[in-house]
Amino acid sequence: MLHPKHLALIASLTLALALTGCGARRSVPEEPLPTKPHSVSPQQPENKDSKEERKPWVRPTGDSIREEMRAVWLTTVYGLDWPKDRADTPDGVRRQKESLVRILDRLKQDGYNTIFLQVRHSGTTIYPTNYEPLSSRLAGEGYFGDYDPVRFALTECRRRGLSMHAWFVTYPLASSKRNPHPILRDHPSWAIHHKGSYHLDPGNPEVRSYVAHLVTDFLRRYAVDGIHFDYFRYPEEAERFNDKSSFIAHGLRHPDREAWRRDNLTRQLREVQDSLRSIHSQALVSVAPLGKLQKIPDLGRPHGWTAYESVYQDPVTWGKEGLVDFVVPMMYYRDVLFEPFLRDWKELVSPYVPVVAGLAPYRIEETGWPSEVIEEQINLAREEGLAGVCFFRETHTGGRFPAVRRIIQEAFKHPALPLAYPRGLAHKPAAPKNLDAAVGQDGTILVRWSMPREASADGTTYRLWAVTTDAHGRREASLLSSTLRDPHCLLVMSDLIDYDCIELGVEAVNTFGVSTPCTEGLELNLAALREEIRHSRR
C-alpha cells in the first residue's frame, strides 16, 4: 500500500506532469493533456547527469498495483441512464452533452476505467446509419445539426482516459404493426416471431452477415476500443423457438439442433472477426453471456437457465478459438448461485480469455439486496483472480445509492492498469532501450528512452514507473504515467524534495495492453543532483 507522503508525491508529480505535457494518471477529470513535453525553459537540459546508475529493472508489484477492468453498462434504451432529454433542438443537444459529461466525470472520479455505451437497441441505433432506424427516444425524428452522440461520447471518454466499448443488443428486434421494422419489410425470413416479439435467426447465414456488416459499418465511423455483444444468444424458452425450417436448410450436418445452435453463435463471432480483419480494425470483441455458465451436477438446488444448455452460448469454445478478447458474464445472483458459477468461469474460461464479473447493484433497489453483497462479490472476484468487475447499470452506482457508491470508490481507490489481452501476445512491443536522464539547471529532469521508429505508428504507448527512497531508507513504488505517447517525459526536481533517490523504469505497451519492460532501469541520486544544481547557480 502507498504511504501518505508518497501519495502527496504522486499528486504533486501529477500536476507537474500535466504542466509539462507528461500524460499522468489522474484522480479527477481534467482537460486532455498534451502528448508532447514542452521545451525546457529557459534552457534545454544540458548535462547528462553523472549521478546515475543502471541496474536490471523489474516492474513493481503490490496490492495497490493490479491489472483490472472497472466497468459499467451505460444504458440508453428508454433513456434509463442517459439521456433524459431528446437532442432534436439546440437546447436538447446541450442538455444531452452536459448530462453525459456529469456522468463521465463522476465515473472517472470514482475510479472506473471502462464504459460500455449502448449504441444499438433492438434494431434501432443512437448513431446515424443507413441500415437501421434512429432511436426516437434519443432524438425524435433526428439529431439537431451535426451532433453525433457516439462521437461526442468517444471524445469525452478519451479526455478522461476511459476506454469506450460500443454495446450492441444483437438479435432481438422491436417492431410494431403500424410501423414495421425495415428488416421485416425487406427480409421477412430473417426474423422469427417468438413470445410476442421478433428475434433475428442466428441460423440464417444472411442474418450473420448482416450483424457482421453492422459492426464494420460502425467501426468505419468510430474508433472505439471494442464491440460488446449483449443478447448474443437464443431467446427465453428457446426450446419453443421455431427455427425448424432454418435447421433443415442449414443445419442437418450437425448431430442435433442444440449443437447447431451453439455453432451458429460461434460462426457469428468468426464472421465478425473476419470482418474486422477486412477493415484492419484492432477493436476488441466481447460478449455478455448469461451468468451461469453451465449446469453444476452437485449444486444441490435448481439452476434456472444457463448459458450453455438454455440459450446455446459456448464461451469455452469462443475463448479457445480466440473469437472474443474477454467475456462479461451477467452474474446477477448471490450466495450459492454466485460463488460456484464464479469458480466455473475461472476454471473453464479464464485460462483462455479474461473474465470480467458482471454484478447487479440494481438488485439493491429492485429486490432488496443489502449493499454489502456487492462488496462481497467484488472481493470474491478478486480472490478468484478474475479480470475485473462491471456493474449494471450506471444509475445504480451513482448518487442515488450512496452506500454502494462508497463501496465501489473504496474498491477502486488505487489506479488500475488496463488488461493485457491474449491477442496482443502475437505482437509484443519492442523493449525500450537506452533509458537515461538529462538534468537542467532549472531543476527539470528529462527522462528519455529509444524505440524503433515504427512504434509511434502502431499505437505503442509507455508507462513510467518510479521507486523513491527517503532519508530513512523507506521505499515506495508508483506509476507516474500510464499513457505516454512519446518516448520521453519531463519531471521537476522540486516535487522530489522529500526523497534522496529515485529509480525509474519504463514499459512499452501495445494496443492490446501487452507490455514489454526495459531491461535496465535508471537510478538517480537526487541528493547529489540537488547539491550539484545549487553549486552551479552560485
For the regions a protein language model found, what residue spans apply to each?
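Active-site-adjacent "subsite" loops/lids of carbohydrate-active enzymes
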Residues: 66-69, 75-98, 165-221, 309-310
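Active-site clefts of carbohydrate-active enzymes
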Residues: 74-76, 284-303, 341-377
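Polysaccharide-binding and catalytic clefts of secreted carbohydrate-active enzymes
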Residues: 106, 112-113, 120, 151, ...
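Aromatic-lined carbohydrate-binding/catalytic grooves of carbohydrate-active enzymes
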Residues: 110-145
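Substrate-binding cleft of secreted/luminal carbohydrate-active enzymes
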Residues: 315-338, 353-424
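Pro/Thr/Ser/Gly-rich low-complexity, intrinsically disordered linker/stalk tracts
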Residues: 403-458, 512-538
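Solvent-exposed loop/turn segments flanking beta-strands in beta-repeat/beta-sandwich domains
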Residues: 452-476, 501
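Beta-strand-rich modules
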Residues: 493-516
